[in-house]
């Protein structure tokens, strides 16, 4: 069977606090581990999406509205719905693993790195679909 949930694939979370949020898979673990004995993925997603920006707004207001609030999480495969989209995040691939979640300082440092990467991606104008909220 072909593997659908690969690193770089964009998915939607279907259950829990982040239900309806878009995530990108950073690491897929099919067999499970000791702490999570089921197929799961380490994901990074957008908790708060950037707001709409117009030409008439000033630079300070645009900067404030262009912020992205990310989250990182270990999610069961059953709670992920893959999409046809992919997002290239080369600098995050090896940085965030399942071990990152063991210590709060590592977790917050990883979240800051994800925030920086997401904001760079958003500013470049690429992957606009990923940075818009899902309408349902």
UniProtKB/Swiss-Prot annotation:
Name of the gene encoding the protein in the UniProt record: rpl2701
Family: Belongs to the eukaryotic ribosomal protein eL27 family.
Described purpose of this protein according to its UniProt entry: Component of the ribosome, a large ribonucleoprotein complex responsible for the synthesis of proteins in the cell. The small ribosomal subunit (SSU) binds messenger RNAs (mRNAs) and translates the encoded message by selecting cognate aminoacyl-transfer RNA (tRNA) molecules. The large subunit (LSU) contains the ribosomal catalytic site termed the peptidyl transferase center (PTC), which catalyzes the formation of peptide bonds, thereby polymerizing the amino acids delivered by tRNAs into a polypeptide chain.
The keyword Translocase belongs to this UniProt entry's keyword annotation: no
GO CC annotation terms, alphabetical: cytosol; cytosolic large ribosomal subunit; nucleus; preribosome
Keywords of the record: Cytoplasm, Nucleus, Ribonucleoprotein, Ribosomal protein
Single GO BP term: cytoplasmic translation
Protein name: Large ribosomal subunit protein eL27A
Pfam families: KOW (PF00467), Ribosomal_L27e (PF01777)
Subunit composition and interactions: Component of the large ribosomal subunit (LSU). Mature yeast ribosomes consist of a small (40S) and a large (60S) subunit. The 40S small subunit contains 1 molecule of ribosomal RNA (18S rRNA) and at least 33 different proteins. The large 60S subunit contains 3 rRNA molecules (25S, 5.8S and 5S rRNA) and at least 46 different proteins.
Alphabetized InterPro entries for the sequence: KOW, Ribosomal_eL27, Ribosomal_eL27_CS, Ribosomal_eL27_KOW, Ribosomal_eL27_sf, Translation_prot_SH3-like_sf
Transmembrane intervals: none
Annotated source species: Schizosaccharomyces pombe (strain 972 / ATCC 24843) (Fission yeast)
UniProt subcellular location: Cytoplasm; Nucleus
Molecular function (Gene Ontology), one example: structural constituent of ribosome
More about this protein: There are 2 genes for eL27 in S.pombe.
């Amino acid at each position: 069977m072909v593997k659908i949930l690969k690193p770089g694939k964009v998915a939607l979370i279907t259950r829990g606090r982040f239900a309806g949020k878009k995530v990108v898979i950073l690491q897929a673990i099919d067999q499970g581990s000791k702490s999570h004995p089921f197929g799961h993925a380490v994901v990074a997603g957008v908790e708060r999406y950037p707001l709409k920006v117009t030409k008439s707004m000033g630079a300070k207001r645009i900067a404030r509205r262009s912020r992205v609030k990310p989250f990182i999480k270990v999610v069961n495969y059953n709670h992920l719905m893959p999409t046809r989209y992919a997002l290239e995040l080369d600098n995050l691939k090896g940085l965030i693993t399942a071990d990152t979640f063991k210590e709060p300082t590592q977790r917050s440092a990883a979240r800051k790195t994800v925030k920086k990467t997401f904001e760079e991606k958003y500013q470049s104008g690429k992957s606009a679909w990923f940075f818009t909220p899902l309408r349902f």
